[in-house]
């Protein structure tokens, strides 16, 4: 048995480059942090539909493979350059509960909603170096001119009224220019 199975997410981004580790470890709103580091910030929605979760999301969300979730994917852009690919999933039944406004966010930041509601609790961050075979790597690279060898990502659960949403943020190469 391997010590670090390929699906594993880790509590510390040990092998991440030092200049990226600062972004990865930031505990507050990534939206606010990006807004502070660029002149023009915007959220570009690219995908939102009911689908099945990625295989490494099933356990953390207490899902079965056939369960439907709302998948929302956006690029966070600084000065029109994509710097983060954000992917969130929430159980379909929770769209009628705690997360009922999620499907209508459009180009508004999910982070703004998550960090302004004092009832929302966040679990500790988990980290992973995504390789080309990971589905989020593939989707994150769609708007990149050159595909990197790997991409670092972080994720955590945000819980409102015992109903979780899993938010994964994939850091794109342009983050190094901020």
UniProtKB/Swiss-Prot annotation:
Keyword Cell membrane: no
Source superkingdom: Bacteria
Binding sites annotated in the UniProt record for substrate: 72, 110, 169
Key words of the record: Cytoplasm, Lyase, Pyruvate, Ubiquinone biosynthesis
Cysteines engaged in disulfide bonds, as pairs: none
A GO-annotated cellular component: cytosol
The reaction(s) this protein catalyses: chorismate = 4-hydroxybenzoate + pyruvate
Transcription found in the keyword field: no
Alphabetical list of Pfam families matching this protein: Chor_lyase (PF04345)
E.C. no: 4.1.3.40
Entry-linked HAMAP family: UbiC (MF_01632)
Name recorded for this polypeptide: Probable chorismate pyruvate-lyase
Species annotation: Nitrosomonas eutropha (strain DSM 101675 / C91 / Nm57)
Gene transcribed to yield this protein: ubiC
């Amino acid at each position: 048995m391997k010590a670090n199975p390929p699906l594993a997410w880790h509590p510390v981004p040990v092998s991440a480059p030092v200049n990226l580790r600062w972004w990865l470890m930031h505990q507050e709103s990534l939206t606010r942090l990006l807004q502070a580091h660029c002149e023009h910030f915007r959220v570009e929605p690219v995908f939102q539909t009911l689908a099945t979760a990625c295989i490494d999301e099933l356990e953390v969300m207490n899902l079965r493979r056939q369960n439907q979730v709302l998948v929302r994917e956006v690029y966070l852009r600084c000065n029109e350059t994509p710097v983060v690919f954000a992917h969130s999933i929430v159980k379909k039944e929770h769209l009628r509960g705690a997360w009922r406004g999620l499907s209508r966010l459009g180009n508004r930041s999910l982070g703004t909603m998550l960090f302004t509601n004092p009832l929302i609790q966040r679990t500790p961050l988990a980290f992973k170096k995504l390789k080309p075979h990971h589905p989020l790597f593939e989707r994150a690279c769609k708007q990149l001119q050159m595909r990197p060898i790997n991409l670092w990502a972080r994720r955590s659960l945000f819980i409102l009224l015992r109903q979780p949403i899993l938010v994964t943020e994939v850091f794109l190469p342009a983050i190094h220019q901020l």
